[in-house]
């Protein structure tokens, strides 16, 4: 039977990305991403939060983009896979480290993440390890320039108008900014 190793995270960076370059010249970025679950405590009735921290690694152009555009507090969508590495510490003890190896990323919120107040919601800010052509960004010299704005696509006219507002499986507004295929289905 086939197996699946797929991770999807939507969270915030706990620190600026750490970007290094391998001898081959390829970039490697390490990120710490926090995800927070909110739940109601059955005993007290209070809303509580549980935060999980995730180590995320990126390679190549995706790592360069993360290093250039992400900052502490940036909200980000990540797709990737779980990888566990085994290594030995100075005393020879075996240690294990579990991380997510990202192959897709989309920056959420305004340009520059939580540190900038300006919103740039009409801009395509997604990058993919699998399709380098879509991840290509012109490298500005000296100063960052905002990407060109895209015009929103007009929905096809099917004669139902805004009928989908009442459909229970319509895409929730909370998922705005998360990459979907052209037909509206999520990329799983």
Swiss-Prot record:
Coiled coil: none
Domain SSB stretches: 4-109
Superkingdom in the source lineage: Bacteria
Keyword DNA-binding (UniProt): yes
Gene3D superfamilies, sorted: Nucleic acid-binding proteins (2.40.50.140)
GO biological process: one example: DNA replication
Protein name: Single-stranded DNA-binding protein
Gene name for this UniProt entry: ssb
């Amino acid at each position: 039977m086939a197996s699946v190793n797929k991770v999807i995270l939507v969270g915030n960076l706990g620190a600026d990305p750490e970007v290094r370059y391998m001898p081959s010249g390829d970039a490697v970025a390490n990120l710490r991403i926090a995800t927070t679950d909110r739940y109601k405590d059955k005993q007290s009735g209070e809303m509580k939060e549980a935060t999980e921290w995730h180590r995320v690694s990126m390679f190549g152009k995706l790592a360069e983009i993360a290093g250039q555009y992400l900052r502490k507090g940036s909200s980000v969508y990540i797709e990737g896979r779980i990888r566990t590495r085994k290594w030995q510490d100075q005393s020879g003890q075996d240690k294990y480290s579990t991380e997510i190896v990202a192959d897709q990323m989309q920056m959420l919120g305004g340009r520059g993440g939580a540190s900038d107040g300006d919103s740039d919601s009409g801009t395509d800010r997604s990058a993919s390890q699998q399709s380098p052509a879509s991840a290509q960004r012109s490298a500005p010299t000296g100063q960052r320039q905002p990407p060109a704005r895209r015009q929103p696509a007009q929905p096809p006219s099917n004669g139902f108008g805004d009928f989908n507002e009442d459909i229970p499986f319509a895409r929730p507004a909370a998922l705005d900014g998360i990459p979907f295929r052209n037909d509206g289905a999520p990329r799983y």
